[in-house]
Amino acid sequence: MSEVEHQELDLNGEMLARREKLAKLREQGNPFPNTFRRDAYAEKLHAQYDEVEGEALKEQDIQVKVAGRIMLKRVMGKASFFTIQDVSGQIQLYVARDNLAEGVYADKVSMWDLGDIVGVAGTLFKTKTGELTVRCSEVELLTKSLRPLPNKVQGLTDQETRYRQRYLDLISNEESRRTFMIRSKVVSGIRQFFLEKDFIEVETPMLQVIPGGAAAKPFITHHNALDVDMYLRIAPELYLKRLVVGGFERVFELNRNFRNEGVSVRHNPEFTMIEYYQAYADYHDLMDNTEELLRKLAIDILGTTTVPYGEYVFDFGKPFERITMHDAIVKYGNGITREDLDSFEKSVEIAKGLGIEIQKSWGLGSVVNAIFEEVAEHQLIQPTFLMAHPAEISPLARRNDENPEVTDRFELFIGGREIGNGFSELNDAEDQAERFDAQVAAKDAGDDEAMFKDEDFVVALEHGLPPTAGEGLGIDRLAMIFANAPSIRDVILFPAMRQK
């Protein structure tokens, strides 16, 4: 018999034993009651009483009611020690036969297994080793666990188990619980930041007839009642800018986007973004906003502006570097000159030398962008704003007044990864229509990620969009940074996984 077969046999035997215990408990009453009300949490009890001496604690006679999942147990005849875990942490219980009503220890406590959820009432005391413990006078099984907790290898280090059965990961892995607490703080901190700056939070369609706002491949579905193909949105941008046209001068949406593309340590097809738009502002204002936001998040979440991430330490306390795409290529491109990047033929030659496959639809801007991604992107470790992107790859961004070949756009890079994208918005309806037409031509030439033309959005621009700047920030990638998580799957509770 193989090791796997032995494990399955052991699991089946364990589950059978637990079901037999559950059957006996049912004979005594409902083994899944809903009447227990706790008044204390493990973390707060430790914070308040860990430093109190045992005698002083005894004199205070502190009564508590706690509940949680059994993580450890030590049975010593007529008494047992259990460690239970609630949302805040763990605390030890001392359950002795003589401290309970007659028959409770033998008939009920003896049925407790690892993974069961229990509620107890009792008095705080310190053990001989000084551990804060609840001496239980009342106990109640709240939920019988029919499956045993995973062992250490399965529960804490096996990635498949962690991602597919996140509930087991959260039970077993304190670091995972911390990661998702940090993610929650990132989301709430961002929302509060924009609300305090008088932004209005809005919701725009997830199902769209025309997917727009980003260069990406969408998911397609069909609306039966309307008999029309629809798309899961790739970005809320065009709807949010319609709202600015309508007079909402500061809007944001914190929600999901969907892109039918690859899965990697940086990409999940379903992801969360904050996208915001501010009238009477430009892309410089948004870069300032972004610095302020990330600095505040670092302090509020970690208590410092220096954030460790893998082999790096990011410094959010210093002004972020600001560099143009062309200057970044020259800086890191090992001999590439600005004159090279102004020539389509020379840029194509450089790109091919770097092993880049040139697409038929590419102009100079796309080639320059591909060169940047190859030679410079991974070099932008400390928080850096990359600016002045070619107009060809920025169909929704305003052209720069001094050099119309580039746009008033920036991308935020941290650790060599793009975290955000923003720009002064294109509010010239005629220019926007022409750029949409160029995107349609690229799509017809085989570019799956080229944008669709949104005629209604052009009509909205014809009514007048005030000078506006907008930005999108990836929540998942920010959570990765603040939680020091190497993969996007580590910060998404239920990431996309290939079917078994």
UniProtKB/Swiss-Prot annotation:
Keyword entries, A-Z: Aminoacyl-tRNA synthetase, ATP-binding, Cytoplasm, Ligase, Magnesium, Metal-binding, Nucleotide-binding, Protein biosynthesis
Reaction(s) catalysed (UniProt annotation): tRNA(Lys) + L-lysine + ATP = L-lysyl-tRNA(Lys) + AMP + diphosphate
Enzyme class at the top of the EC tree: ligase
Cofactor comment: Binds 3 Mg(2+) ions per subunit.
Binding site for Mg(2+) 1: 411, 418
UniProt binding sites for Mg(2+) 2: 418
Cofactor(s) for this UniProt protein: Mg(2+)
Enzyme Commission number, as recorded: 6.1.1.6
CDD domains, per database record: LysRS_core, LysRS_N
A biological process from GO: lysyl-tRNA aminoacylation
InterPro entries according to UniProt: Aa-tRNA-synt_II, aa-tRNA-synth_II, aa-tRNA-synth_II/BPL/LPL, Lys-tRNA-ligase_II, Lys-tRNA-ligase_II_bac/euk, Lys-tRNA-ligase_II_N, Lys-tRNA-synth_II_C, NA-bd_OB-fold
Chief location: cytoplasm
Gene Ontology MF term list: ATP binding; lysine-tRNA ligase activity; magnesium ion binding; tRNA binding
Annotated localization: Cytoplasm
Any one GO cellular component localisation term in the record: cytosol
Similarity annotation: Belongs to the class-II aminoacyl-tRNA synthetase family.
Subunit structure: Homodimer.
Annotated HAMAP family: Lys_tRNA_synth_class2
Protein name: Lysine--tRNA ligase
Gene name, Swiss-Prot/TrEMBL: lysS
